[in-house]
Amino acid sequence: MSTKYLAAYALASLSKASPSQADVEAICKAVHIDVDQATLAFVMESVTGRDVATLIAEGAAKMSAMPAASSGAAAGVTASAAGDAAPAAAAAKKDEPEEEADDDMGFGLFD
């Protein structure tokens, strides 16, 4: 499901008890969102006749069931990849000449 259509449905439900697909489409077009008719039809089929508060509660329950952090194995892989890249970055940094300090470039803002 696309969250932009769900947000438009929630907004439309503030003015109507049961917003139509045309109502949601009008809100999307008002904020210059390109509307994919197939996706919008699927979203409307899934949420029509349901209370927005219930949809939010169901979504919150599903989100709380998802893991919040990545696994330790994936973190180890990224740490080793970052460790390999560090010496290469240090070597590249040594090749660059140091730039001289610009000082205040003659502006004297706080004199």
Swiss-Prot record:
Write out the PTM section of this UniProt entry. Answer: Phosphorylated.
Q: How does it assemble?
A: P1 and P2 exist as dimers at the large ribosomal subunit.
Record the organism.
Leishmania infantum
Q: What is this protein called?
A: Large ribosomal subunit protein P2-2
Q: State the Pfam families in the record.
A: Ribosomal_60s
Role according to the record: Plays an important role in the elongation step of protein synthesis.
State the family it belongs to: Belongs to the eukaryotic ribosomal protein P1/P2 family.
Region (Disordered) location:
86-111
Among the GO biological process terms of this entry, one is:
cytoplasmic translational elongation
Q: Which GO terms describe its cellular component?
A: cytosolic large ribosomal subunit
Query: What are the protein's UniProt keywords?
Result: Phosphoprotein, Ribonucleoprotein, Ribosomal protein
